[in-house]
């Protein structure tokens, strides 16, 4: 909770000294929705801190316990949780929450392996891209545009995070073959493509349900 409060206060202090205070009211609202997400922009300071703390804790739990191994394939729900985090608390706070979640999860069950910072970076970028796309593009109340934005999130995070960051990093460190051969092996033989499909399917299924839970007052369009 203390970390979440510190992060929130840092942004507030930065805003007071920056261009935010020279914006029109409408632009201020759009800026708040982009940075804090549409959900947090409509809530008070205490609610903002609570949401950030809860989602950071969820990221930690996802990295500690939501990982499953079947033969040579490792499944996890971190992509889904990271995307949900970025959408609900915004791209910047989402990035920080997901990066911290990966770090704490590693410390919990490192089992003697070295820390791989690119994994935390990729999860942070999943939240960053998801937050920007879902909160930055106005859906104008059109349900079909909501799903178009989700599809863009899935494609971009797959290409940027799974392929460009994680696969490239593992290839540089461990692979003895060409990049494209390793990419095919990692996606299909090691099952990373199916891990992505499961996480993205969960995003399409659960996000619309979460947005309809009235007590949470989550704004996604």
Task: Report the location of each language-model feature.
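Loop-helix junctions at membrane interfaces
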Residues: 3-8, 12-221
């Amino acid at each position: 909770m203390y970390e979440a409060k510190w992060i929130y206060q840092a942004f507030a202090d930065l805003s007071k000294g920056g261009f935010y205070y020279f914006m029109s009211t409408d632009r201020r609202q759009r800026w708040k929705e982009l940075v804090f997400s549409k959900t947090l922009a409509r809530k008070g300071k205490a609610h903002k801190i609570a949401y950030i703390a809860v989602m950071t804790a969820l990221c930690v739990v996802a990295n500690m316990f939501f990982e499953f191994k079947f033969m040579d394939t490792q499944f996890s729900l971190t992509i889904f949780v990271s995307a949900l985090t970025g959408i609900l608390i915004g791209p910047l706070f989402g990035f920080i929450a997901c990066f911290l979640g990966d770090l704490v999860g590693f410390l919990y069950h490192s089992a003697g392996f070295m820390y791989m910072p690119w994994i935390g970076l990729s999860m942070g970028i999943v939240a960053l891209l998801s937050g920007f796309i879902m909160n930055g593009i106005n859906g104008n109340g059109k349900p079909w545009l909501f799903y178009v934005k989700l599809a863009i999130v899935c494609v971009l995070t797959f290409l940027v995070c799974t392929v460009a960051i994680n696969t490239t990093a593992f290839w540089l460190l461990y692979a003895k073959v060409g990049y494209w051969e390793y990419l095919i092996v990692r996606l299909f033989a090691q099952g990373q493509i199916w891990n992505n499909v499961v996480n993205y399917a969960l995003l399409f299924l659960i996000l619309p349900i979460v947005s309809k839970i009235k007590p949470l007052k989550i704004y996604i369009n």
